[in-house]
């Protein structure tokens, strides 16, 4: 994940995107839905951190069609954050702006693949593209794109917290 983010941040193109794959097409898999419904703020916070790291102004959550409750909870969380000035333009008076968008999947298993997912968000048929280029170079709308799944984004805030609260080797800890 860190390598992907670093690759996107280093691209010359200034327009960049952060995308979350919440399609979870595997039969019987419900982890993404449980995170999006149980704590959508955790997912959004992780995406905001990614956006800040790569200087992206727009993020997209691609949610499988069978998760209407996830969409409702995400929309509610986004609205609350926008009302409080934590999402949108000039967050907390800073020069950081980040807008969140939700796209509903069409139920195609293939859209779990990165290039098929970005094609679907763009309004095209969700078909995989040949690689290279990878999404970090030319993803959504042919722009550098960070693409991670729900679990990855949801764990980013916790990882950062652990890094800043754990003793470091410089403190004599191992």
Regions found by a protein language model. Name each.
Residues 1-5, 107-118:
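Conserved phosphate/anionic-ligand binding catalytic regions in large, soluble enzymes, centered on
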Residues 40-52:
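Histidine-anchored nucleotide/phosphate-binding helix
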Residues 58-71, 75, 106:
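Conserved short loop/turn motifs at secondary-structure junctions
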Residues 73-107:
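A glycine-rich helix N-cap at a beta->alpha junction
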């Amino acid at each position: 994940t860190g390598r992907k983010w670093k690759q996107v941040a280093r691209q010359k193109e200034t327009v960049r995107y952060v995308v979350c794959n919440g399609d979870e097409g595997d039969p019987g898999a419900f982890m993404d839905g449980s995170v999006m419904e149980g704590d959508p703020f955790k997912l959004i916070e992780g995406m905001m951190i990614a956006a800040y790291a790569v200087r992206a102004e727009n993020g997209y959550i691609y949610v499988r069609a069978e998760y209407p409750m996830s969409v409702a909870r995400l929309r509610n969380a986004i609205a609350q954050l926008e009302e409080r000035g934590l999402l949108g333009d000039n967050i907390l008076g800073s020069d950081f702006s980040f807008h969140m968008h939700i796209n509903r999947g069409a139920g195609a298993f293939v859209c779990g693949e990165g290039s098929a997912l970005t094609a679907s968000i763009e309004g095209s048929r969700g078909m995989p593209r040949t690689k290279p280029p990878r999404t970090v170079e030319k993803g959504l709308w042919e722009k550098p794109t960070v693409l991670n799944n729900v679990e990855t984004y949801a764990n980013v805030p916790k990882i950062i917290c652990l890094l800043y609260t754990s003793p470091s080797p410089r403190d004599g800890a191992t």
